[in-house]
Regions:
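Extracytoplasmic cell-surface/polysaccharide-interacting catalytic and binding patches
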Residues: 4-85, 162-164, 176-199
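Catalytic cores and adjacent binding grooves of peptidoglycan-active enzymes
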Residues: 7-11, 119-202
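Envelope-exposed proteins and targeting segments
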Residues: 63-67, 71, 97-99, 125-129, ...
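A mature extracytoplasmic/lumenal domain signature
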Residues: 65, 105-108, 133-135, 173
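Stable alpha-helical elements in mature extracytoplasmic
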Residues: 78-85, 89, 139-146
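Long, contiguous hydrophobic alpha-helical segments, chiefly transmembrane helices and signal peptides
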Residues: 79, 101-109, 129-131, 169
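Extended, low-complexity, intrinsically disordered C-terminal regulatory tails
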Residues: 84-116
Length: 202
């Protein structure tokens, strides 16, 4: 008989964050280097952001049946690629979680960055969005797995932030390229439903 170590109640309750979502200096630099290598401007002031909006470099996030924005979103604009990510990810989130995705932040000029923001934050470019992190449970499990999979595919760089709690997503799709996401809902559901390889001998 194959012995399996018992799992404590504390271990069962403690949510597990995939390694891909752990924040690090390397992760920050990857996002920053992407922005620099694609010559993305870092907007300094709200006026600079308004100019980018007027020129069509940033597009509005308006919300729909699959995603919503909190009132705290000061500038509900992002690059076309970041918006395409939200539009593609939100329906899968709704299917998996039964509730709309919530965007808590998007493009943000450097002069409006919070005091604890990293100097190399890419929010001033518009390629990043912050999402509300679901409470512990099946939805959070799905979100973590989905973001880790998309990061492994090189489409995004994601971090599960703690102060304040949220999910930071930078969309690493070159400007002018369409964002196409795999069907993560069905894939992760199939993985979760697969029988465990650890069986007691009969």
């Amino acid at each position: 008989m194959l012995a399996v170590a018992p799992v404590s109640n504390a271990q069962r309750r403690r949510p597990q964050t995939p390694p891909e979502l752990h924040g690090s200096k390397a992760s920050v630099e990857k996002m920053y280097d992407f922005a620099l290598s694609h010559h993305l401007p870092f907007y300094l002031t709200p006026a600079n952001l308004d100019d980018a909006i007027a020129k069509g470099r940033l597009v509005p996030l308006t919300g729909d049946a699959t995603y919503e924005l909190t009132r705290g979103v000061g500038f509900s604009y992002a690059t076309r690629e970041a918006k395409q990510f939200v539009l593609a990810f939100a329906p899968q989130y709704l299917t998996a979680c039964g509730t709309p995705l919530t965007v808590t932040s998007a493009a943000r000029p450097m002069s409006r960055q919070p005091h604890n923001a990293n100097p190399h934050s890419v929010h001033p470019t518009g390629i990043a969005v912050d999402l509300r992190r679901p409470s512990a449970g099946p939805c959070l499990d799905w979100v973590r797995g989905a973001l880790a999979e998309l990061e492994d595919k090189g489409l995004i760089e994601a971090t599960e932030e703690r102060h304040p709690v949220h999910l930071h997503i930078a969309v690493l799709v070159p400007p002018g390229t369409s964002v196409v996401l795999p069907q993560i809902v069905n894939h992760l559901a199939a993985v979760k439903a697969a029988p465990s390889v650890l069986h007691s001998a009969r």
